[in-house]
Amino acid sequence: MHIEVTGRGPDLVLIHGWALQGGVFAPLVQRLADQFTLHLVDLPGHGHSRDDTTPLRLPFVVNAIAAATPPAVWCGWSLGGLFALHAAATLPKVRGLAMIAATPRFVRGEDWPHAVEPAVFEQFGRELASDFGGTLERFLALDVMGSAHAREELRTLRQRLVERGAPTERALLEGLRLLESTDLRGALPTLGKPSLWIAGQRDRLVSPAAMQAAAALALGGQALTIAHGGHAPFLGHADEVAAALQHFVAGLSPADGGQ
């Protein structure tokens, strides 16, 4: 699995969302590389890991990333948040958890109302085979919908989608299955390490209410909503997201994390 390492300082693992790759975090790299050693993951089937055969399932991916990185804070965006949360719940070496537009459960249920209907991800899966490019374009449009900087963010995501080669259909389908079926809420009350939940106020995929509910389930969880932000708030509001991550990591004690 390809993991780009850049910067200097405390270690921070960044995991991208569905269909993208680690380069999507460029605005955060520009702002954080002087304070952090950043580990930018390309998930299997995406970017420079396009030919990686690791199954896109939580334990396989998390163990592969953990084997290649030192003790660190893990930060996941959207789908990437499921990997980061699983790591925080299972690995002592994870010092803290930052979730950007990511919750432990992405689909709606009777006891989890602030989420999308399962049919949303099911439809994307059905459409991939018949209209690969169009399906990805529609998903990118959802990523930026509502953001105050939607046009610029969509242009950036389109560039990031193809600059390292398109993701594989297999990886996209595996990612959709994770989004449809994963429920990690049970891990939150016993998480045992600090967590930060960063939402975009105008996010159409993951509502701020869901982020706040997740933070409330995690002991000591902190919730932050980026005003006018969409599903990728680190693009149009990179200064605010970077500052939040800096403040969060600075507040961690040396006891947070292990070997």
Swiss-Prot record:
Pathway: Cofactor biosynthesis; biotin biosynthesis. InterPro entries: AB_hydrolase_1, AB_hydrolase_fold, BioH, Carboxylesterase_BioH. GO terms for biological process: biotin biosynthetic process. Its main location: cytoplasm. The active site is at S78 (nucleophile), D203, H231. It is an enzyme of class 3 (hydrolase). It is found in: Cytoplasm. Substrate binds at W18, S78, L79, F139, L140, A141, L142, D143, H231. The physiological role of BioH is to remove the methyl group introduced by BioC when the pimeloyl moiety is complete. It allows to synthesize pimeloyl-ACP via the fatty acid synthetic pathway through the hydrolysis of the ester bonds of pimeloyl-ACP esters. This is Pimeloyl-[acyl-carrier protein] methyl ester esterase. The gene is bioH.
